[in-house]
Amino acid sequence: MSVLLIAKTLGLFFITAIAEIIGCYLPYLWLKKDGSAWLLIPAAISLAVFAWLLTLHPAESGRVYAAYGGVYVVTALLWLKAVEGASLSTYDAVGAAFTLTGMAIIAVGWNH
């Protein structure tokens, strides 16, 4: 994979993860934090965008989902810190590094 393709793939995975997290976080706010049921409308839209974004990758869907998982984990941890204000631990960092390593191994194999 070229450096440009890797950057595009990681960027698309990151945007995809944000769409998925928003699509799941809004119902969480409704169910657990007394948010408005109206939050379900943007949540549904966000999840539809998430599904569409996953179709934009040039590999079989199973490989895309597996590789995407690594970026999702890192994005979810960043969300945890930025949006929910939680502190990240060394375990979070080590786990994120392992998942990104797995993602990289899978993504490199797309062309083989």
Swiss-Prot record:
Q: What is the name of the protein in this document?
A: UPF0060 membrane protein IL2332
InterPro entries assigned to the protein according to its UniProt record, in alphabetical order: UPF0060
Identify the PANTHER family for this entry.
UPF0060 MEMBRANE PROTEIN YNFA (PTHR36116:SF1)
HAMAP family in the record: UPF0060
**Which Pfam family, any one, appears in the UniProt record?**
UPF0060
Cell inner membrane keyword on record: yes
Residues annotated as transmembrane: 10-30, 36-56, 64-84, 90-110
Membrane topology qualifier: Multi-pass membrane protein
- Can you tell me which family this protein belongs to? Belongs to the UPF0060 family.
Q: Which domain of life is it from?
A: Bacteria
Tell me which UniProt keywords the record has, alphabetically.
Cell inner membrane, Cell membrane, Membrane, Transmembrane, Transmembrane helix
Q: Which GO terms describe its cellular component?
A: plasma membrane
- Where in the cell does this protein reside? Cell inner membrane
